[in-house]
Amino acid sequence: MLLRLIVLLIFMSPVVFATLWFSDNVGSVQVEWLGWHVDSNMPVLLAVILVVFLIFSALSRLSALVADLPSKLGKSRQARGLEKGMSALLAALDAAESGDVGEGRRFAAEAARLLNNPGLAARLDRLLPRPPAQPVAPTRLEAAKGRLFARKPGPPPPPTPVVDKIQPVVVEKLAAAPAGPSREDLEAFSAKIRAGEWGAAQAWIGEAVLAGRLTPLVAARWRSVALEGQALEASPGDPARPLRLAREAMAADQTFLPPALHVIRAEVSEGRKAEAETLLASVWPHVPARVLLDACAPLWRDEDQDACLKRLEALAAIAPHHPDGHLAAGEAAFAVQKWGVARRHIMAALKIAPDALGCRLMAEIEEREPGGSARSAEIWRRREHEASLSPAWVCGACARVVEAWAACCPSCAGVATIEWTRSVKAEEALLPPATTASSMETPRLFRST
């Protein structure tokens, strides 16, 4: 403020001196300076003085703006830094709420730097979730050491021969957890499932887990089998009950395909596209099976084929070591005649597992792509006949192929033996007449134009 006043006085001094001089010289004015001679009257000189005053005032205003420019720029930078710091703080709180420890610590450090508060990162780190600490049991050596110091030293033992001092070493063998269920437990569970006693089967699983006869993985799979088998039964009094049981089966074992397929088919039949696609994205990392894509195919029939290709390529990237995602992406690329993309995905699938559908698609690419080789197409046709069949519902006990999953195999009555897997060529003779033709041909999600 003082600087502005000094500048204003400097600019106003000539005006004040000129005004005093003009008050002493009324009428015409003559100005002589360094040989220059100017004759004028009072109005003209007053106008000149006014112009000079306006120029000095503008210069004063400009100098004030220039002087305030660094402070304004600094305040603007501080405001931007404060805004970024608050955004990083909110992101750190969101990461803490979602349980993402890595992102939470990164945003907390950024917020502490931008807000110039070193203690903020430590306070936010205390909000992040931490795994529960495992109780550390005292070792045998520590327990023995405590007992040693608790006792008073007694008299020394009498001397004995060295041979008598050697004690036999006894190694205690710890009871290992069973690798799989025993035959008795398997028969007990199978009997309840065959009889349709779903509630009794669930109760028996809980008792077996408490008794230590079942591992958590086996218990989760058997619980999911019982719930999905119960969901497949007709419930005329409660139409929503099968879907509810299927969702419970999914929650019990996320790696079990039948309940996930059950729920996705229900969402597709109701036309709930967003729910079905969300469920597919959550299930695909655990069970990337082609049958899930076949179930969602009605939702994508009217969509752009390029959009479908992008979706399937994203699914293939989620499970890059499973062939079904690459096969579906290759088939979608074949439908829009993107030969390079189709070759890349199909060859990735064939490197993982030889498949008849993949060989057939490669033969068609060689036949339709400009510059393709007829000889290569013939080679792929021969490999198609030599490759394994496409995945199907196969009973692991009797090697029969069935049309749909069931808790009990309709052929051998095996419980929890039907899985979605690739069947070998030799089992074609074991197929029932109704399923032989259907299992040899894989449904196509896309048709080339």
Swiss-Prot record:
Expression induction or repression: Part of the probable mms6 operon.
Membrane-crossing residue ranges in chain numbering:
40-60
**Chief location of this protein?**
membrane
The superkingdom listed in its UniProt entry is Bacteria
TPR repeats: from-to residues:
323-356
Signal peptide residues are 1-18
Which ranges form a coiled coil?
none
Say if the entry is tagged with keyword Mitochondrion: no
Q: How does it sit in the membrane?
A: Single-pass membrane protein
Any idea where this protein resides? Magnetosome membrane
Q: Name one Pfam family in it.
A: HemY_N
Keywords, A to Z, come to:
Biomineralization, Magnetosome, Membrane, Signal, TPR repeat, Transmembrane, Transmembrane helix
What GO CC terms are in its UniProt record?
magnetosome membrane
The consequence of inactivating this gene is: Normal magnetic response, fewer, larger magnetosomes; cells accumulate 20% more iron. Deletion of the 4 gene operon (mms6, mmsF, mms36 and mms48) gives an intermediate magnetic response with fewer, smaller magnetosomes in irregular pseudo-chains.
Quote additional remarks: This bacteria makes up to 60 cubo-octahedral magnetosomes of about 45 nm in diameter which contain membrane-bound crystals of magnetite (Fe(3)O(4)).
Q: What does this protein do?
A: Overexpression in wild-type cells increases the number of cells with double magnetosome chains significantly. The 4 genes of this operon collectively influence magnetosome size and number.
- In Swiss-Prot or TrEMBL terms, this protein is called Probable magnetosome protein Mms48
Q: Which organism does this record belong to?
A: Magnetospirillum gryphiswaldense (strain DSM 6361 / JCM 21280 / NBRC 15271 / MSR-1)
Q: List the top taxonomic levels of the source.
A: Bacteria, Pseudomonadati, Pseudomonadota, Alphaproteobacteria, Rhodospirillales
Gene name as annotated:
mms48
